[in-house]
Amino acid sequence: DNALIESFSMTVQEGNGVDLPGNHGLGIRSNVTKEYWGLLEKRNSVSIKGKLQFEKSAFVGYRNPDIPALYVRDDNRPMVIVGEAKISGDAYLPERGIKIGNILGYGYTRPQLVYGNTFQSNAQLPELCSQVDQQLKLMTGSTYRPKGNTVTLKQDLMVKNSFKEETIVVQGSDYLNLEKVTLIGNVVVWAMDKIQVRATSQLRDVVLVAPQIEIEQGTRGSFQAIASERIVVGKGCELEYPTLLAVQEANTSDQAVNTLRDPVIAIESGSSIAGAIIYSNKGKTKGMPKYIGIDREATITGEVYCDQALELKGSIYGSV
């Protein structure tokens, strides 16, 4: 534990270990390495004293006290606020500011527009962490294939795999139904077309990769879902920290015109997610705007990053 904590104050490059000299006086040699598990940074510590060896792995998060509650890029239009929406904290807004709107005869009900400081935003959003962006591009690319020992999906499959061991890859047909499946730890689930997570699925710390991922109503667990087309979280799901949902579409110059009204990432009513939601589309969308949709009584605790549109009817405790 001490070696991992000490490494947080040091620069650790992916694939290169860092020796920690602070432990030499105790006769302990420690080495910390960094790699990515899905989109999450994972650090591994190995400490040796005499003939004893201790290993520890941990996911790493960062707390940024300067991150605003809201950052809306400046596209020469004001932000519109309606209903009972409330912005608490610092907000970066377009030069034209924020104005009260009206939907079906309902205006804005609060006495203040922003409960915090306001600043002018830029035409570009702050970039994702470069390493996270690279991982997302890699894992949503058409040539991506996870590496590891392959296990064929079957009903009642149970896999618990330590991060000290080789990754286990669960695959099967183009469509994977995780009915009554238990997967914990160093496991990747990969499908060519679609993964369906059921309420009977027990998933913890695993990574799901497919063009489309559907999470059934009432699902509980914590995992990463990484897709190139769409993610749907059904009603009443409880996805614990560090859950991560990410969609990145291909960057093509001749994208088809979008005629769908459904969100690219949909969080249905009554669901709670602790972690991060990312939607990245580097190309310009034709037709109807693509968006993240967070329904009424849905709660996100953490960060939402969206470089297109966001329809927020629920609550976000963190940053957008």
What are these regions (language model features)?
Residues D1-V12:
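Membrane-proximal N-terminal amphipathic helix
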Residues N16-E35:
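Short amphipathic beta-strand and strand-loop transition segments with alternating hydrophobic
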Residues T33-Y175, E179-Q202, V207-V209, G218-T219, ...:
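Short, ordered "entry" segments at domain starts
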Residues G221, A227, I231-K290:
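Eukaryotic tandem repeat interaction scaffolds
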